[in-house]
A protein has these predicted regions:
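Conserved beta-loop-beta/alpha segment of the NTase-like Rossmann-fold superfamily
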Residues: 59-157
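N-terminal glycine-rich phosphate-binding loop and ensuing alpha1 helix
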Residues: 1-67, 99
Length: 157
């Protein structure tokens, strides 16, 4: 199962935090809230993520493009192409992250529609990229499959 994470909104209610970065990149414990959501989903076996970006998309792209260098020791031979070697492994090494710019003003349904081309016909879940909730994804998936429905919506208080 893949996860589409909606990470393109303006975050107007958190203006002091989101004036300079998108809301999913606001840090909690030294990591972006988006990372915490992905980490939580990975505990349920979800390791393929499509991050549907918009507002300040470049910051999310830069975060994942530079993820290995930020989280590992490495050796680089300057002046040689393809000479970068990372020395440490981390729990996220098996994650696959697709960052898809889905438009600056695109609404939720439009973001899902634009990200759908990366799903390859697989079942998927959609989650907001700026809020972490205590949801038992295994139980949710089981309930969804048992009901044989097209869509299951989960809300939390």
């Amino acid at each position: 199962m893949k996860a589409i994470l909606l990470a393109g909104g303006l975050g107007t209610r958190m203006r002091e935090e989101t004036e300079f970065r998108p809301k999913p990149m606001v840090e909690v414990g030294g990591r972006p809230v988006l990372w915490h959501i992905m980490k939580n989903l990975s505990h349920f076996g979800i390791s393929e993520f499509i991050v549907a970006t918009g507002y300040k998309s470049d910051m999310i792209k830069d975060y994942f493009l530079n993820y290995e260098a930020r989280n590992n020791d490495f050796t680089i031979e300057l002046g040689r192409q393809e000479s970068l070697v990372f020395h440490d492994a981390h729990d996220e090494a098996h994650w696959s992250v697709t960052v898809a710019h889905t438009g600056e003003a695109t609404m939720t349904g439009g973001r899902v529609h634009r990200a759908a081309r990366y799903l390859d016909g697989q079942p998927f879940l959609v989650a907001y990229g700026d809020g972490l909730a205590d949801v038992d994804i295994d139980a949710l998936r089981e309930s969804h499959e048992r009901a044989q429905t097209l869509v299951t919506v989960t809300t939390v208080q």
